[in-house]
Amino acid sequence: MSNDYYEILGVSHDASADEIKKAYRRKAMKLHPDVAGPGSEEEFKKVQEAYEILQDPQKRAVFDRGGDPNARMGGFGEGGFSSAGFDFTNLVDAMFGGSSPFGSGGGRGPRSRTRRGQDALVRMRLSLAEAVFGVTKSLEVDTAVVCPKCQGKGAQSGSEPVTCDTCQGRGEVITVQRSFLGDIRTSQPCPTCHGYGTVIPDPCQECSGEGRVRTTRTINVKIPAGVADGNRIHLDSRGEVGPGGGPAGDLYIEMTVSPHDVFTRHGDDLEMVVTIPMTAAALGTKVPMHTLEADREDFAEDTKTVTVEVPAGTQSGTRIVVSERGVPRLRRNGRGDLGVTFIVQTPTKLDSHQKDLLRQLAEAREETNASASVEKSGGRGMFSRIKEAFGG
């Protein structure tokens, strides 16, 4: 290294005091003998000397004029390098995030035995009618609850947690080692109290000192009308009780809706398929049918059926909409619709009399085999046309 203190620290001659300090930190951390090895001691001394001169305005002015700033102040001599008015502990603080092992330092302190519990997730199976119209159901939930014997304290009746003799309540043990830099202090959680700062000499036999036990409890859950498969209900503070009888987490109940034999759900609409005979489709008819309300014994009888008017000439795939007989809109007013798709059933077995009647009908309508017409695809595939015919 040269004797130019600015060059030693790697700063310009007009560097500010803050720039000089930062440069010294970088150099000192890189060249300190405990980091770079004993061979760097001489270079480290020069860095210390450069910082001592340049951080002092009077010494820096003497050096800038070409004088010897150590002529009156004295140099390092044989006593090793000085601190130059800068605590090396601060350098280590920068590396250890403010938890320096040098000097006294502040520890983490004991951790609390009482902590918030985890959230819990359970699943509830519903029928389609329960999901659509809402229901109140009981549900068994397996979670941790506050120990009924010690009420969360973790200690037997008449016993209390006492200060840990090993760490004196600090929750950590500190070891001190002598080094070239001075005392190096390191801390770790106390092995006796596991960082709590207290020990339970007579733990509760019911919970083994945990302050909580697992149990299966039954809760009543009100399911709002209109929930869908996968929806969740959030219940505050009904989840797992925390260690030490701490506050309970939240409980989430996820809905699983079973399929229905007749109805399917599409958003807020219900869909069903009804088969009618060929004659009814041709002549028109009125079809009474059960609605989803029929699955609920607690509903009025007049809500359980609806009559749908089928117009004459109805074709297979015709869909008729019954307004406001679908799913109640969740957290909104109104209901979706009920869509009824009709399938026209063609008879497969006819006696001779029935065949004669159909022949007479065909003759009256002048229908023959040549009356069949080919539907134009319009660029659509066969499956697309079939799907459209059934309201897809």
Swiss-Prot record:
Pfam families given in the database record: DnaJ, DnaJ_C, DnaJ_CXXCXGXG
Cofactor detail note: Binds 2 Zn(2+) ions per monomer.
Residues the record lists as binding Zn(2+) 2: C164, C167, C190, C193
Amino-acid positions noted as binding Zn(2+) 1 in the UniProt annotation, renumbered to this chain: C147, C150, C204, C207
CDD domains: DnaJ (cd06257), DnaJ_C (cd10747), DnaJ_zf (cd10719)
Major location category of this protein: cytoplasm
Database matches in PROSITE patterns: DNAJ_1, DNAJ_2, ZF_CR
Quaternary assembly: Homodimer.
Protein known as: Chaperone protein DnaJ 1
Gene name as annotated: dnaJ1
